[in-house]
């Protein structure tokens, strides 16, 4: 790591992550390289190595930032509401997920590569952000569904978070994929991120009432 203030180091890392995010809007994960990232920053590829050893570490930092932003929304739901019905709680969580399409894309398509090819200390930092999202959803359930037991909450978590892996591929379908589904005679109803997430949340909340 080059010498400099913590603020300067953080700013440089942020610039690199922002460049990666910009490329990810139009390029696939496999096509994005440190060289390509360097083209949209003030850094050379060699300079980037001062902050990240692999492109996967840059993506992991982007992934962590997505969880941080989702956590802010979850905390705001917790702090800005005193009482929420099941429908209201499901709606607010679904909206927060709808805002994090990039998180869902990384989760479903690139999670393994990012974790495998990143240094342990960076993976630990990411896991803290991920762990905070688990904690925040638990806090929401404890506040707005006080009837749910610890086991109920645990069941909810271990269904909903794995479910999140499938949201992006089920809602971000290309024209080519749609044409193939139609040609194959597959009867499929396309849903938005919000619709799919809301339906799952409502089902889980209702199950816990039985």
Per-region residue spans from a language model:
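Basic, helix-initiating cap at the start of DNA-binding domains
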Residues: 1-27, 36, 40, 81
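Alpha-helical structural segments
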Residues: 11, 15-22, 40, 57-77, ...
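Amphipathic alpha-helical segments used for helix-helix packing
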Residues: 100-121, 175-179
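A contiguous binding-surface segment within folded domains or other stable secondary-structure elements
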Residues: 111-142
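C-terminal peripheral helix-coil segments that are non-catalytic and often amphipathic
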Residues: 135-147, 163-210
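Membrane-interface starts of transmembrane alpha-helices
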Residues: 145, 149-157
């Amino acid at each position: 790591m080059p010498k400099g203030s913590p603020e300067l180091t953080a700013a440089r890392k942020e610039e690199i992550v922002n460049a990666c995010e910009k490329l990810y809007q139009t390029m696939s994960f496999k096509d994005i390289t440190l060289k390509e990232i360097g083209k949209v920053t003030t850094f050379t590829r060699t300079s980037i190595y001062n902050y990240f050893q692999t492109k996967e570490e840059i993506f992991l930092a982007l992934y962590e930032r997505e969880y941080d932003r989702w956590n802010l929304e979850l905390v705001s739901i917790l702090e800005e509401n005193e009482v929420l019905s099941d429908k209201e709680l499901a709606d607010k969580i679904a909206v927060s997920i709808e805002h994090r399409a990039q998180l869902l894309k990384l989760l479903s398509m690139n999670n393994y590569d990012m974790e495998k090819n990143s240094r342990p200390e960076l993976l630990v930092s990411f896991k803290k952000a991920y762990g905070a999202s688990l904690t925040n959803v638990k806090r929401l359930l404890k506040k707005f569904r006080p009837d749910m037991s610890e086991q109920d909450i645990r069941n909810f978590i271990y269904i909903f978070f794995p479910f999140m892996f499938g949201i992006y591929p089920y809602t971000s379908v290309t024209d080519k994929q749609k044409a193939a589904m139609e040609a194959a005679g597959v009867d499929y109803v396309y849903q938005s991120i919000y619709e799919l997430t809301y339906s799952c949340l409502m089902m889980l909340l209702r199950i816990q009432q039985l």
